[in-house]
């Protein structure tokens, strides 16, 4: 009887200590982690057609390079708060993504968003996960080979992107005389060139290759010209959330050290997409260098 009672008291003490530890840890959480532990889930903003970063492929949840990285972040968040955190998905566009992060409607924005100084004043960013730049997509046989060929031509951009500003600024600076129109998303922008409404689609080169692959249109459309901007991508979260920043930075460093960033890149840029096609875009030396620099150095 004494042994049983002793074991019961020991078990009770251990349970109380565990509960106390969990409670203390919960009290130490702030920002997004505190919110996630309280509500029991993480809200992720995704894009519907940002191939291969964040997109819908048939039925089911969003997929893509950014989505896989965000799933790794959510797994780390679950471990940090001491409970499994399922994901709630919210579709965002180029125009709605920033306000959704700022307002707290979404916890992470997992798409194809450029980090720049203007946005960094309003939101936090993960370490760089990709480096792209603005180029032009045109139909086969188009006379357009570079930005200077856009005189009196209609160019479509996706509303709310850095590409929209880049094209406007270049047009104003060099007086090219192009006509710029804005579409809701990348799929709509692609469709405007396909229909003949626009003669070129200006966005990040990798997204152009993604749209061509998604539509099985290799040989029908080409990406041309020099880079018109520099666009490093990152995952957005609320500005000033230091706990989440540390967790995200650590997650990226661990993935870089285990070469998981490299494997995730190969999965989405060199292997077959859900459509069956490949983008076939080897990792640039610049991005490879960025990933290597993330590796945690031994103490």
Predicted regions located by residue number:
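Extracytoplasmic small-molecule ligand-binding "clamshell" domains
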Residues: 26-109
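Extended ligand-binding regions for polar small-molecule ligands
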Residues: 27, 33, 68-76, 148, ...
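Ligand-binding clefts/hinges and TM-proximal coupling segments of bilobed small-molecule sensing domains
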Residues: 27, 162-181, 219-221, 253-299
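Short helix-initiation/N-cap motifs at beta->coil->alpha
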Residues: 29-31, 84-99, 142, 180-192, ...
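Bilobed "Venus flytrap"/periplasmic-binding protein-like clamshell domains
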Residues: 43, 48-52, 62-79, 114, ...
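Periplasmic-binding protein-like
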Residues: 48, 130-141, 213-252, 271-298
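Acidic, polar ligand-binding/catalytic clefts
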Residues: 71, 75, 82-149, 289-298
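A ligand-binding cleft/hinge motif common to bilobed small-molecule-binding domains
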Residues: 96, 111-121, 166-173, 187, ...
């Amino acid at each position: 009887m004494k042994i049983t009672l002793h074991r019961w008291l020991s078990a009770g003490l251990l349970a109380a200590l565990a509960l106390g530890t969990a409670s203390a840890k919960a009290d130490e959480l702030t920002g997004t982690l505190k919110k996630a532990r309280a509500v029991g889930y993480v809200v992720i903003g995704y894009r519907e057609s940002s191939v291969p970063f964040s997109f819908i492929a048939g039925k089911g949840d969003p997929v893509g390079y950014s989505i896989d990285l965000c799933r790794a972040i959510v797994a780390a968040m679950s471990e940090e708060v001491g409970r499994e955190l399922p994901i709630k998905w919210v579709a965002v566009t180029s125009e709605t993504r920033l306000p959704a992060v700022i307002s707290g409607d979404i916890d992470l924005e997992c798409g194809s968003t450029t980090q720049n100084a203007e946005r960094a004043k309003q939101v936090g960013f993960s370490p760089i996960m990709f480096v792209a730049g603005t180029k032009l997509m045109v139909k086969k046989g188009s006379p357009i080979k570079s930005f200077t060929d856009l005189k009196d031509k209609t160019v479509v951009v996706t509303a709310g992107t850095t590409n929209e500003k880049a094209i406007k600024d270049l047009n104003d600076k060099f007086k090219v005389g192009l006509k710029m129109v804005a579409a809701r998303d990348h799929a709509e922008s692609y469709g405007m060139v396909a229909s003949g409404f626009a003669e070129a689609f200006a966005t990040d080169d990798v997204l152009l290759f993604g749209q061509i692959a998604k539509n099985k249109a290799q040989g029908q459309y080409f990406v041309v010209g020099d880079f018109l901007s520099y666009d490093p991508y990152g995952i957005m979260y609320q500005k000033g959330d230091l706990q989440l920043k540390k967790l995200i930075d650590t997650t990226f460093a661990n993935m870089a050290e285990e070469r998981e960033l490299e494997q995730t890149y190969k999965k989405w840029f060199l292997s077959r997409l859900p459509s069956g096609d490949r983008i076939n875009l080897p990792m640039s030396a610049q991005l490879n260098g960025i990933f290597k620099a993330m590796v945690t150095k031994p103490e």
